[in-house]
Amino acid sequence: VNLKIRQGDYVILTGENGSGKSTFLKLLLRELIPQQGSIKMFEKDISGGFKGMKIGYVPQNSISKNQNFPATVEEIMRTGLYEPIWKRGISGKKYQKKILEALSEMEMDSFLTSRIGELSGGQQQRVMLARALVGKPELLILDEPTTGMDSVSIQSLCEVLQKRNEKGLTILMVSHGSLKPYTGANRFWNAQEGRIIEE
């Protein structure tokens, strides 16, 4: 696989189960080491790792479905910084404001004190996206973020991502089905039998 992602790209990667989407993500996230080929990000070969680049990652089904899972939405959000607050010179009040702003963007600010396990799958994904965005990443990677969402929620999510992309955020979203009707993505990739083809 030889792929390039340019700064400011909004890429959608689709494909059936077993087509190679998960393997590609594992290569990108360094869970697997490529035996050949390369992955270039912002004109730099990242096959050896991101080397300090700020990455926001929203994994699929990343939260426990146990309704008694003790963490609250606020506690989940507080893990979204790349460095401790004191290192960044951010006061507790300012960070609390950032948390609320990120949750508000995802229409989840009213759930701040709710247990994450009590939320629906779609609501949990919204919280995880807000968590990924609160640290101001350079690249946002999303693995099946629309799982459990209806068409209205998908449209709302994609509008948020589009606005972020227009402000310069580079996005790579993996999806089982086509999201062309919903997104303003500028590139569409399709995984087929271990190969990734640009449409």
Give residue spans per PLM region:
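Helix-to-loop junction immediately C-terminal to a conserved catalytic motif
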Residues: 29
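Conserved ABC transporter NBD signature motif
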Residues: 37-51
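Conserved ABC ATPase "signature" region
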Residues: 78, 92-111
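Conserved ABC ATPase signature
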Residues: 115-119, 123
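Conserved catalytic motifs of ABC-family nucleotide-binding domains
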Residues: 136
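Catalytic Walker B motif of ABC-type/P-loop ATPase nucleotide-binding domains
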Residues: 140-143
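H-loop/switch region of ABC-family ATPase nucleotide-binding domains
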Residues: 175-176
